[in-house]
A protein has these predicted regions:
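Conserved, well-structured core segments that form or line functional sites
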Residues: 1-211
Length: 211
């Protein structure tokens, strides 16, 4: 079932954790591309110097101030990154989707990424946008209403442990533990030492096993 406006209206930290284990879906020209969300970062509208909204609204971050459930896509180091707007319109808070575990359209994703290693396919915000075929033209899309982009509740929710850490690749707010991820999942980016054990698990396998 597609996530509704109320879901995205949650406080940003709560939304970040709630997005883990959900399905991101793109009905693209190449076919259906989807994956489990396994890593996110929260960016708060106040007391968070790393948030793009900290200095107010601009032409580049305007979508971040839209209604909850809006896609905010920006470019950094020639890579596109996608965020989901949270809370209320005009506030400027969002959750960065950092990694997904691919489910459908993997061959198309591999062609988009020009890689052969599955683990390198979607383990980072720029990588997953490239794999899913997302870029600037998708900025501002409403995930609640759009016909080809949405996030949904899986028919069977897997069980997993949520871990947290400081966010990656920022210079301010480095002490804030606003990064959440599925502990042990092999598609999570960053250092393996952040996990409590081996990084060799898959949500798909967990669901099939019922564990």
């Amino acid at each position: 079932m597609r996530l509704d406006r109320t879901f995205y209206s949650q406080p940003t930290l709560r939304l970040a954790k709630s997005l883990l284990g959900k399905h991101f879906v793109h009905e693209s020209d190449a076919g259906r591309l989807s994956g489990w969300i396994v890593e996110v970062e929260a960016y708060l509208w106040r007391n968070d110097p790393a948030c793009h909204a900290a200095r107010g609204i601009t032409n580049k971050n305007r979508s971040m101030f839209a209604q909850p459930g809006t896609l905010y896509i920006y470019c950094i180091h020639s890579c596109w990154c996608m965020n989901v707007v949270s809370e209320i319109e005009g506030r400027g808070a969002a959750v960065l989707i950092r990694a997904i575990e691919p489910i459908e359209g993997i061959n198309h994703m591999l062609r988009h990424r020009k890689v052969l290693n599955l683990v390198e396919l979607t383990n980072g915000p720029g990588k997953l946008c490239q794999a899913l075929g997302l870029h600037r033209q998708h900025d501002g899309i409403d995930l609640v209403l759009h016909d080809s982009l949405w996030i949904e509740e899986p028919s069977e929710s897997p069980r997993f442990r949520i871990a947290r850490s400081p966010r990656i690749g920022i210079r301010q707010g480095t002490e804030l533990l606003y990064r959440y991820f599925v502990d042990g999942n092999r598609y999570v980016s960053g250092r393996a030492s952040c996990h409590s054990g081996p990084r060799n698990q898959l949500l798909g396998n967990s669901r099939k096993a019922g564990t």
